[in-house]
């Protein structure tokens, strides 16, 4: 997203990580967004404090490595036991989208925004959409406005949470009128995988 969205959504990653007990990578377009000079509305720390669950912070600190109460991590396991432990954490990842939505809703209430796991922009009756994330979204919105003003019916789905991927929320965000993604729709034989804006003559995706 843009610089303002980075500011607004960074607390979501931290707060959801604390409550969900799952590590997050809070990422954005490194050069495009980090080197852009824009005026933004900066968060007040008191607003952040209101949203922060201090019990969750205390619980997080209790699990930190400490010589006063040592415990072992990263011990060796055979494949069968490791697989069971790996699957045991699935419930945390399954619950995580709801936790992220909870904090997005709190931010929406404070800022008057409308952040969701997937935000739709464009024609309500679009027949083609792009699904994208990052700084491309602002550019895509301008293109969508232009195309729709000239008789097209197109839209954009902005991805806010990439992993774990909430497929059912993506489906909810796409208008029912959509029947294909991007201009591949117009071809007799559509590609199932392709990179937007790049003619891939190396891997031919």
Where in the sequence are the language-model features?
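Short acidic, glycine/serine/threonine-rich loops at helix termini
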Residues: 10-11, 35-42, 142-143, 192-195
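Catalytic cores of large soluble enzymes that bind and process phosphate-bearing ligands
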Residues: 1-8, 88-99, 132-135, 162, ...
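Alpha-helical scaffold segments in soluble metabolic enzymes
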Residues: 5-16, 102, 106, 142, ...
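Conformationally flexible catalytic loops at phosphate/diphosphate-handling active centers
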Residues: 24-120
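Thiamine diphosphate
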Residues: 105-205
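Solvent-exposed alpha-helices and their adjacent loops that cap or buttress functional pockets
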Residues: 16-20, 34, 40, 121-124, ...
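Short basic, glycine-rich beta-strand/loop surfaces that mediate nucleic-acid
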Residues: 13, 40-42, 179-180, 200
